[in-house]
Amino acid sequence: MKGLKRTHRCTEISTANIGETVTLMGWVQKSRNKGGIIFVDLRDRSGIVQLIFENGSIDAKGFEKATKLRSEFVIAVTGVVEARSGAVNNNLKTGEIEVRANGLRILAEAETPPFPIEENSKTKEDLRLKYRFLDLRRPDIQRNLMMRSQVTTLTRQFMANEGFLEIETPMLTKSTPEGARDYLVPSRIHPGNFYALPQSPQLFKQLLMCSGYDRYIQIARCFRDEDLRADRQPEFTQIDMELSFVDVDDVIDVNERLLAYLFKQVLDVDVKLPIQRMTWQDAMDRFGSDKPDLRFGMELQNVSEVVRGCEFAVFKNALEAGGTVRGINAKGQGSMPRKKIDKLVEFAKDYGAKGLAYIAIHEDGTVKSSFAKFMTEDEMSRLVEAMDGQAGDLL
């Protein structure tokens, strides 16, 4: 690196820099040798720019080095920014320009990587994790981490403007049992005793409120010794906050405005405030989930009172046990084949249900049901009406 200093990241140059001499450093994405001219895609965290090595533009020694370039070589290159001589590449931020190299230094050679360093890799996860340092070079992974960094920075700015103080709380502390087991760290100066890593800063932030700090914020690392699930990890980071002299609406208001600010700044998406609110019970009643996707149109419908008194044992037993009978109207699915319905039944069983009862309403208005013989025609008609069943629907 002696005598070299990077002047730009790869995508920091544009048509405004045409004619300028720049020094770039990064990884070779790919190299194409066309005989007297070599094209190289140079990559850093900002993106890709095309380099040209050509006899006459670079000395013979430099051109010889360029012939040896392979994927993931780390290089430093000096050259002049030019408008692309060939077709513009609209898929690249730097697609209108290229850098004609007049100097090259190979900073590190590379063996053939175990998988392509490219976006949306199809490589198996265990291989990617084995070579995690290579996986982290992939553009989609880098974008995720850069977005995370941006969100963290913007959160700190927003909360500071709202009067919050960022205060770090202890990592080595006594156990404060919450929803999982603690991770324990043995104490050197107190043999036989252990520190517990925090499951959350809950007690500390409450003490801060008692101490008069009024508004606290921390990008807090938390540790929970529990089984992995899609939304559970042994260590995770959360935006942790506490406020004094407020009610629940004040807390919701701050969080809504924070989310709206982040969506606008990071994704340029406008979030309409106030955000729609829903009680936990309403979410469970309508969607069967405490984190429903409101775009999902097939809401659960409670038809317990409609079927109360019918002789269908499944409904009757559920109601007598204090349960409910609920259904979904799958619009336009009345002609679904029996084989596919059977697959849905098995799917429901996988998640703890004993089965599914269905009503198919044909286009001619006739009804086919798995339990029709246990209900009168009037009971079936009232059930279809309660679920807004129309010709072509599957209930």
Segment roles from a protein language model:
Residues 1-395:
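Class II aminoacyl-tRNA synthetase catalytic cores and aaRS-like
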